Amino acid sequence: MLNFSEQCLDMAQSILSRNIGAINDDGSISPLENELSLACEPGHAAMALGEFYRATGSTSLEGKDIVDLVSKCIMAQSNDAEYTEDGLAYLSLGLLAFGPSKDRNAVWDKLSEDTRKNLEKRLLSRTDYTDFFQVFNIAKAVARFSMGLSKKDETGKLIDRFLERIQQTSTGNYFDDKAESEDVIDGAFDIFGVVAFVFIRQSLQLHANMHLRDRKIPSLRTFAEKYLRLLPDVVRSDGLGWSYGRRIGAYGQMHCISMILQAMRDNWIAEDKMPEYMDVLRRLFQFFFMTYLDQENGYLVIRDEQRSAENSCTTRMANFDAARYLCQWARLAKTIGRNMNSEAIAEKNISKYVSFDNSGRKEQGVFIYKNAETAMHTCLPLVAPNASNTSSSLAFPHIPGIFDWPADKYLPILIPELTFGEHVTTPSYYGKRCTTGMGFRNSFFFRYEQPELINKDGKIIKGLGSCKVSWSFSGKKLVGDFIYSVQNQVTLDNFRLVVAIGAPHAEYHVPMTYALGQNGQGVSIEKDDFQANWLDTEVVSEDPEYRSYWGKIHYLQVYARDKAMVMRPGVQYRITIALEPDIAFAE
């Protein structure tokens, strides 16, 4: 993997060279045109530069002093105006990259007395979190103890608490990054679970006490391996990684690559499974390299005239994160030292439901279907949206390039949306009685019920109605059947279902990435008790709101009812949609 290591380091150096000029004298980060900086960006920059130092041992880049740049970032991130928990956690690990203690840390020596006091005050503040922010507490605890700011090491206790809460909130022992609001349903089982374990493992690697690291790795492995085992089933043949939930796109590649490399370094992968994971790693990296890296100019692109990302992620931050990960991959690859040129593993058929939670209150998970003969490969998530009101967590078959959705906008893609007054409902986010099995003619099915309808923001609406959902999968044909009932007579104000027609990025894509063939998505409505109609096709090619993480959405086909309808108790209302897409490839 030495060539891979060198390639990663070259890319990291190129990305940093293009972005360190954005670090101002006061440590703030200048945004790209048409973007706004985030308060946590100095921390992300500090960690990227710290990882570059760990990978190369060099304290200069493009004639600039890295130690000086990191000290400026710390000054900005630790003051009152720019302080954020995530930014502080990233800069903590960036600081530790230059030395495990105050006495042997060039960046600490460079900090002014005021900045040291601010940093100490921030690191010593303790707040207990029940969501993803708890991993930032772990990073702060590592820095507190390693830098001698606290004689008591709380790292182990915080890791134990993090793992205990996973067991309390998930019967499947997956991480739930639940929303702060009590009104929103919990169960945000998305890529933040992968990120959490990658970040904790990274923090432990920088801990001054290697014995603590050795004690905690086995318990981390118990939970992290669940995600590791998911990756071969989730990653598509063209290398596309995690494709549902928040913060995907480029991050959906980077986080998965990091988890696999960490697992290889720690010997978590059995020898007989190594060829499979090497193949997954190769595909993930190739997709990342060809889809998101501008190889001519040497930087990461997450937004342009054809694609987009969530507003919570800026291009500048993504570039620093990419540089950080590339430096880590370079180091890990050197440590692993294996040959990465493994043969491609034959694709196998998959039909499985992975249960994240099966409590008395709700059931959540993801249904994965792959048919090697037809190239159909989809994930159908049944997970909470956290506070993110977008399409990425909706319960439809996620197949970028075939069934697309906008990166940062809500649309009821391939599933019905029923509006009752102020309540806009979706058959997503949770279910009860989730079942899967084999149906007629070797088809597979995934079924669930919603005893209470839920709105698009993730709030359950008591006493309105219920929904039964059944998806069947056979070859490349998918059929979704939705049956609605109401408890009392109610007026349905609006009904719609949206089909988005998109394409991969015209320039940045792997040759075998999925794209629609001449026959399109093969959409048909087989049953409709709502008496809706297809509206005129909307052309959205030039609208920046309708860009996915991977390419542009060109058209929207909306199936809607344009007038009110009275729904009565005791009557079932069914809508059945069939999909038989023509799966082709970009080249």
Predicted regions and their residues:
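Extracellular polysaccharide-recognition and catalytic grooves
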Residues: 120-350
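Short coil/turn connectors between adjacent alpha-helices in alpha-solenoid helical repeat scaffolds
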Residues: 50-62, 96-109, 147-153
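Alpha-solenoid repeat junctions
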Residues: 46-54, 92-100, 142-146, 201-205, ...
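Beta-strand-rich recognition/accessory modules
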Residues: 531-587
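Alpha-helical solenoid scaffolds in eukaryotic proteins
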Residues: 7-18, 24-31, 65-76, 113-122, ...
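Extended polysaccharide-engagement surfaces of secreted carbohydrate-active enzymes
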Residues: 237, 253-536
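Well-ordered mid-protein domain cores that form the structural environment of catalytic cofactors
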Residues: 64-128
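Low-complexity, Ser/Thr/Pro/Gly-enriched N-terminal "stalk/linker" regions
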Residues: 1-66
